């Protein structure tokens, strides 16, 4: 009796993931416009035409990279906010999760930071604007609740605090290197210490 043909779904899935990883690295290093399909194919050791067996365009690769990263990130954000932690603990968890994302999805974060302003003009990427709005609502909500319950100072401008947190946390993708001498846990703890407790020593 002839055995049924082997299911190569897992093999195709693994190859697809490998190609996305290669593309993400190139997009992060060179930028989307400067990276061609041929560049990706060359880095993967295949012909350009073979890449189209897996993806119909360069944009579809970018879309899949960003959706995977953002779906995971926002799923964690929503769980944190819904968990019932106090305001300070919630902010700490949001910041830590953000740094963990920079560590785990470094190329995807770099792509997002570099390209989001251009991508949102493309109908395919309208979800990026929606997630930006949700990000603002989640983080602003935590800050406002913290001011109200006394976790955070009442004299802070919540809007400015939000912008400061958003920009200073994510800019770490420019200098943080996964696997380097400084761990993501150390970076997150130092950042939170500076933000929540300040740089100056307590007065005696």
From Swiss-Prot:
Which Pfam families does the UniProt entry name for this protein? Answer: TetR_C_24, TetR_N
**May I ask which residue range the UniProt record assigns to the signal sequence?**
none
Gene Ontology biological process terms, A to Z: regulation of DNA-templated transcription
PROSITE patterns membership: HTH_TETR_2
Q: Which residues form the HTH tetR-type domain?
A: 13-73
GO MF annotation, one: transcription cis-regulatory region binding
Q: Which InterPro entries match?
A: Homeodomain-like_sf, HTH-type_TetR-like_transc_reg, HTH_TetR, KstR2_TetR_C, Tet_transcr_reg_TetR-rel_C_sf
Q: Does the keyword Transcription regulation apply?
A: yes
Q: List residues annotated as DNA-binding.
A: 36-55
Q: Which UniProt key words apply to this protein?
A: DNA-binding, Repressor, Transcription, Transcription regulation
Spell out where the chain crosses the membrane. Answer: none
Q: What top-level branch of life does the organism fall under?
A: Bacteria
Q: Is rRNA-binding among this UniProt entry's keywords?
A: no
Q: What does this protein do?
A: Controls the expression of a small regulon that may play a role in the utilization of cholesterol.
Cited PANTHER family: HTH-TYPE TRANSCRIPTIONAL REGULATOR RUTR, HTH-TYPE TRANSCRIPTIONAL REPRESSOR KSTR2
Quote the subunit structure annotation: Homodimer.
Tell me what this protein is called: HTH-type transcriptional repressor KstR2
Look up and give the organism this protein is from.
Answer: Rhodococcus jostii (strain RHA1)
Its taxonomic path starts at:
Bacteria, Bacillati, Actinomycetota, Actinomycetes, Mycobacteriales
**What's the name of its gene?**
kstR2
């Amino acid at each position: 009796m002839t055995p049924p043909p082997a299911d190569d779904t897992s093999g195709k899935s693994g190859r697809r993931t490998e190609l996305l990883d290669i593309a993400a690295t190139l997009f992060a290093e060179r930028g989307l416009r400067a990276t061609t399909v041929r560049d990706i194919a060359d880095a993967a050791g295949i012909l350009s035409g073979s890449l189209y067996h897996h993806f119909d365009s360069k944009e579809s690769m970018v879309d899949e990279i960003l959706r995977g990263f953002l779906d995971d990130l926002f799923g964690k954000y929503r769980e944190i906010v819904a968990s019932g932690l106090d305001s300070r603990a919630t902010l700490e968890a949001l910041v830590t999760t953000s740094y963990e994302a920079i560590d785990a999805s470094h190329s995807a974060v770099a792509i997002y930071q570099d390209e989001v302003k251009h991508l949102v003009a493309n109908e395919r990427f309208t979800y990026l604007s929606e997630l930006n709005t949700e990000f603002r609502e989640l983080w602003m909500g935590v800050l406002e609740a913290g001011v109200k319950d006394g976790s955070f100072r009442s004299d802070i401008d919540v809007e400015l605090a939000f912008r400061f947190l958003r920009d200073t946390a994510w800019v770490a993708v420019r200098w943080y290197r996964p696997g380097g001498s400084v761990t993501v846990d150390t970076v997150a703890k130092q950042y939170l210490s500076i933000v929540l407790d300040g740089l100056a020593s307590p007065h005696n």
